[in-house]
């Protein structure tokens, strides 16, 4: 039985792949669970159109990620003011990725998804300069220094 996968199936393929499987596996497992559709000429043309659209979207996503990288790395200084506990430079609490995303926006940078920000440790717990990485795309990574200042 010839099928087109609509979801990632272990040991079989990725969405959009045309696979040849035994009739029982296709009829009793893949089709009822919505993991595949029967391969017809119309379905193959539709999958090809979707694949071309995804490739075009990926190229646009890469261009957009490069623009965001230039904007983030072009920021002169990203400063975050936080309460400190005493004069030792330790913070009262910690700086999270959401705080860093807000600091980038406040510094005049683009809006960045907090899930794409990678801190040197899980949380920043002291004042000073910290290297922060932003994963914008699998091929594009922006790096900048975050200056944490006590209030």
Curated annotation (Swiss-Prot):
GO biological process terms on file: translation
Assigned keywords, A-Z: Ribonucleoprotein, Ribosomal protein, RNA-binding, rRNA-binding
Listed GO MF terms: rRNA binding; structural constituent of ribosome
Domain of life: Bacteria
Pfam hit, one: Ribosomal_L9_N
SUPFAM superfamilies the UniProt entry points to: L9 N-domain-like, Ribosomal protein L9 C-domain
InterPro entries associated with the record: Ribosomal_bL9, Ribosomal_bL9/RNase_H1_N, Ribosomal_bL9_bac/chp, Ribosomal_bL9_C, Ribosomal_bL9_C_sf, Ribosomal_bL9_N, Ribosomal_bL9_N_sf
This protein's record includes keyword rRNA-binding: yes
GO cellular component: ribonucleoprotein complex; ribosome
HAMAP family: Ribosomal_bL9 (MF_00503)
Assigned protein family: Belongs to the bacterial ribosomal protein bL9 family.
NCBIfam families: L9 (TIGR00158)
Function of the protein: Binds to the 23S rRNA.
Name of this chain's protein: Large ribosomal subunit protein bL9
Protein's organism: Rhodococcus erythropolis (strain PR4 / NBRC 100887)
């Amino acid at each position: 039985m010839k099928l087109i996968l609509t979801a990632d199936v272990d040991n079989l393929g990725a969405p959009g792949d045309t696979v040849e499987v035994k009739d029982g596996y296709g009829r009793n497992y893949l089709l009822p669970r919505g993991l595949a559709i029967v391969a017809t000429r119309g379905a193959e043309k539709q999958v090809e159109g979707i694949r071309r659209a995804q490739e075009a979207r990926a190229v646009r996503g890469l261009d957009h990620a490069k623009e965001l990288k230039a904007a983030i790395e072009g920021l002169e200084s990203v400063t975050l003011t936080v309460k400190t506990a005493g004069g030792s430079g330790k913070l009262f609490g910690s700086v999270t990725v959401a705080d860093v995303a807000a600091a980038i926006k406040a510094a005049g940078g683009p809006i960045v998804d907090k899930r794409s920000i990678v801190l040197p440790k899980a949380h920043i717990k002291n004042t000073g300069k910290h290297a922060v990485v932003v994963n914008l795309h699998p091929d594009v990574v922006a790096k900048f220094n975050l200056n944490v200042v006590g209030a």
